[in-house]
Amino acid sequence: MKTKNFPLNKIAFACTLLLANPVAWAEDQFDASLWGGGSVLGIDFARFNVKNAVLPGRYEAQIYVNNEEKGESDIIFADNPATGRAELCFTPKLQEMLDLMDEAIVKSPNAEDDTCVFASEAIPKGTFDYQGGDMKLKLELPQALTIRRPRGYIAPSRWQTGTNAASANYDINYYRSGNPEVKSKSLYVGLRGGVNLGNWALRHNGSFSRFENHSSSGFTDKGKNHYERGDTYLQRDFALLRGNVTVGDFFSTARIGESFGLRGLRIASDDRMLAPSQRGFAPVVRGVANTNAKVSIKQNGYTIYQITVPAGPFVINDLYASGYSGDLTVEIQESDGKVRSFIVPFSNLAPLMRVGHLRYQLAGGRYRIDSRTFDERVLQGVLQYGLTNHLTLNSSLLYTRHYRAGLFGFGLNTPIGAFSADATWSHAEFPLKKVSKNGYSLHGSYSINFNEIGTNLTLAAYRYSSRDFYTLSDTIGLNRTFKQFSGAYLPEIYRPKNQFQVSLSQSLGNWGNLYLSGQTYNYWEKRGTNTQYQLAYANRFHILNYSINLSQSIDKETGKRDNSIYLSLSLPLGDNHSADSSYSRSGNDINQRLGVNGSFGERHQWSYGINASRNNQGYRSYDANLAHNNSIGSYRASYSRDSLKNRSTSLGASGAVVAHKYGITLSQPVGESFAIIHAKDAAGAKVESGANVSLDYFGNAVVPYTSPYEINYIGINPSDAEANVEFEATERQIIPRANSISLVDFRTGKNTMVLFNLTLPNGEPVPMASTAQDSEGAFVGDVVQGGVLFANKLTQPKGELIVKWGERESEQCRFHYQVDLDNAQIQNHDIQCKTAE
C-alpha cells in the first residue's frame, strides 16, 4: 500500500489549530469559524459536513471490488451540482480496472470527452466508499454483476511496456596460477544484455575468454582472444497470442521433444501471462573442491557459468533458468592444475496442465550449434493440452529435408502418483551413404510425494529401444561429417540404448534427512553398463551440523569401480560465523580440510573464508577468499598455495550497467525484467525491494528482478536520505511485461524548513491562517499560531515575501529574507513584517 510523507508544516499547522481551539463535534458539523468562516482562504467548508468528504481533484488509491484488491490507479473527484459536493468520476481507466459485467453499468464514460460521468449514476447498484486516510476506494455491489476471474488475474491492458533503456550484465573471472615450472593465467567475461525500445526487446549473450601459459623452458602459449556468441534475438509479447514472438538466434524452448539452436522465427505461449493461480527450472549444482578451484558449467557445449570456489563443498543455485533440455557438464580445475568433471542430468519433463489449457510452440529456421549456423532448415511444432483434470496430452513434430520425427505422449495424475510417458518415431536419411534409418524411442517417468511421512520418490526411465533411432543433432552431424570426408569416414557415435534413474528423499524429523539416488545407462555402440549410486544423510547434534555422503561409480566395460565417502562438520561461532571440517576418501586418496567462514557488515555485505587441507600423501594447501556485495554489484578475491609450490590468485566481479533517461546506473546483475528507480535529491535512501540497494548520488537505483505480468511493489525507505527531502509517496506498484525495463519515478521535493517569527509594526503577531507568497506569486507557506510562518516552499535563497490574511491592502505585509536553501536543518528567524503605510 502506498504511504505518504506528509509535509511538516501541514502537520504542525493542524496540530496548532487543534491545541489552540478544542472543538466539540456534533452531527459531523465542521466549525468554519476557526478559519474566519472560510473567507480568508476562499474555501467552502460546508462540503465537510458530509461523511468522507473530499475536495475536487486527482488522487491515487488502491481499488477494491467486494474486498478483492484490483490494483492501484488515479481517480478523479469533481463537483456534482446536483448534490453540492465532490463525487467520484467513472473514467474509462476506472471502468477497465473494476472489470464489471455490462449489466452493472448503465452509463459508460467517453474516452474522447472530459465530461465527468459520476460513478453513482454509472453504477446505481454499487456503493463507493473513498477512504482518503488509507488511500483506498472500495466498491460494493451484487456478486452477480462482477466478472468471475481467477485469483490474481490482471487485465492485459494494465501490463506496462516500460521505458526505453539498455542494460548489460557482466561476470568477470580472472584466474592466475603457477609454480616454478609453469605459469598460466586466464580471463573469462560473460555478457548478457540488450536494448528495449517500446514493446520490443533486443537481447544478446556471449562470453569472451583468453588464456596464456608460460614454462620455465621458455615455451609460451598465448591463446587467441575468443568471443563465443550465444543467443541474439528480438522479442515482444502479444496478449492475443498469450505468448511471444522471437526473431534471431535462439534455442527452441520445447518442454517435450528435442531442443536445439535456430536462426529464424519462433511463436510460443508464455504461461506467466496466466494468473498466478492458473500457472502450472535450472538445476542446483553440488560438488566438492579439494583446493581453491575454478568451476565451469557447460550446456550443449557452451560455457554458461564460471566461478572460483574455496576448498570444500559448493552449491551453485543461481543458474539462469533454461527453457531447453541438455545435461550440464561441470568441470572443476584444482589449483594444482588437475581437472575433474561430472554430469548433472537436466531434462525438462512435461508437467501436467489444467483442464482446457494449451501450451504451444512453432519454430522454424536454420539449424545452429554454438556460434555456427548451418544450411539445414528446421521446422518444429509442439502442442500440450490439458484434456481433463487428470490427463494431459503432449505432441511434437520435427521436420527437415533429411529428418522427420514425431512424438506423442501423456501425463497422468493419479492418487498413487504422477505418470508420464511418450513415444518418438524418427526417420533419418544419409544421402551419401544411400541409406535411411527408422527408429523409435520410449520414455516414461513416475513420481510421488508422501507428505505425511516426508517422502519424495522420483522414478524416471529413458529407454531407446531401437538401434536405428537418431536425433536431429545425430543426423545433421553425421551428414556433415560424411560430406566433409566424401562418405569415406564413419565416425564413432555413442547413442543411448537404456537409461534408468531413481531418486528418493526422506525427512526423518529430528533424526535428520536422507537422500538416495542411482542411475544406470548404456549405449548401442559401447559394451558394458555405467552405474552410479549416491547416499546422503544430514542432521544436527545440538549446535553441530553434520552430513555424510557415500557414492559409487561402476564402469563394467573397463571394470573400474570408484567408491568415495565424504563427511562434513559445521560448528557455529557466534552470529554469522562458523568453523567447518571435512574428511573425504576416494579409492586410496584421503583428503582432510579445516576452515572458518562467515559474513559481517551492517547488512552482511561482506563474506570470507579461510581453509587448510591435506591428504595422505603429504600434500597440503591453504586458501583464503573475500567477497563483497553492494548496490552496484558483487566482488570477490581468493588466494591459495600448496606444498608443491603451486600458487593461484583469482579476482572476480559481477554486476550490470544500465543506461536510461536519467543517466547511467551501476547495479547488481539484472534479470529478464527489472526496474529503475529515480528519486531526485534522495541519494542514500534504501530500496526496500532489493537486497543491499540504495539510491546513488544522482538519485537512481536498480531493482534487479521483477515478476512479469504480476503486481510488484517497489518501496523506498527515506531514513538515510537528507532530512529535508520530502517524498510524495514511498511505495509504488508496477505490472511489467516480460523483458521490460520499468521506470519508477518517485516525486520528491526539497523541503527546506525555514521558520519566520513574524510580528507586525504594532508588535502583534501576524494573524494565524495567513498565507505567504514570493515576488512571483508562488505559494511558500502558511502562518500558524503565534505568527510563525512555515516557509517550506522557498525556491530562492533571498528575496521578498508577501503575507496575506485578507484581500485589502491593510490585510497584507511584506519582508525581505536571506536563508541557506542547502541547509537540511530547521532555520529560525525573527522578522518584522511591514504593512502599507
Swiss-Prot record:
Pfam families: PapC_C (PF13953), PapC_N (PF13954), Usher (PF00577). Residues 1-26 form the signal peptide. It is a multi-pass membrane protein. Essential for piliation. It comes from Haemophilus influenzae. Belongs to the fimbrial export usher family. It is found in: Cell outer membrane. PROSITE patterns: FIMBRIAL_USHER. This is Outer membrane usher protein HifC.
